Amino acid sequence: DTILFVIKPQGWRTPVNADQIPQFYYIHKPAGSPAGYRFKGVSPTGPLPKSVDFPLYPQKEPDNFKAIMFADPQPRNQQEVDYVIREVVEEIIGTDAVFGVTLGDIMFNNLDLFGPQNQGIALIGIPWYNVIGNHDNNAEAPSEELSDETFERIYGPAYYSFDYGQAHFIVLDNVEWYHDKAGKKMSYRGGLGKRQMTFLTNDLADVPAEKLVVLLMHIPLLSTR
């Protein structure tokens, strides 16, 4: 199982779906996600196709641009999704920002609400990227590896990168899940695993030194606790 994705280069755009979510990836899970969980994962994709193609379209990208960032909307139910749309989304429809990002805790554990909130955010009319937070994982998953299956079905990979103008944006999943000493209850902490560190190292190796690098993640790198 894997997710293949393209790193959007400067001056190009990827397609977006009806919810303005960038479609820069291909999910390969022949058997799909494990069944039996409350929140659906990825459906079986079958065998890998002969080719996996990522369309890119040219676009103008100025050095100076605006982007919208917000974090922790955390709606628990449809009523709170409506609050997000009314109090936040409606205020920024018509913005001149070129894209937006939700920096994690898109939901408050009820992952069935991803869809309704995505539909609301799509009204802003710009590509919208998403970072995974601790409340966006499937709490029923038996391991960290399976905790983001629902997120992947909706948004694609939990870590990736893209260019816009003279900036390079790196999205990271820094929510590490682990079992308690009894091996039963799952808890989380901030951190990056070996695979992500390898991706980060390889990604930065191709970024010019003069380019601005922006890290996007949910849990702060430094804590006063």
Model-derived regions, located:
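Long, structured stretches of catalytic cores involved in phosphate-ester chemistry, encompassing
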Residues: A209-R225
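A general structural motif
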Residues: N64, A97, G125, A209-L212
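Active-site-proximal beta-strand elements of phosphoester/diester hydrolases
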Residues: N64-Q74, Q166-E176, V214-L216
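A short, solvent-exposed beta-strand micro-motif common in secreted/extracellular proteins
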Residues: T2-P30
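Extended active-site neighborhood of metal-dependent phosphoesterases/phosphodiesterases
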Residues: P30-A31, G41-P44, L113-A209
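Catalytic metal-binding/acid-base residues of hydrolase active sites
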Residues: Q74, I106-M107, H135-D136, V175, ...
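Divalent metal-coordination and catalytic microenvironments
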Residues: D72, G100, D105, G133, ...
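N-terminal active-site segment of His-dependent metallophosphoesterases
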Residues: S33-F114
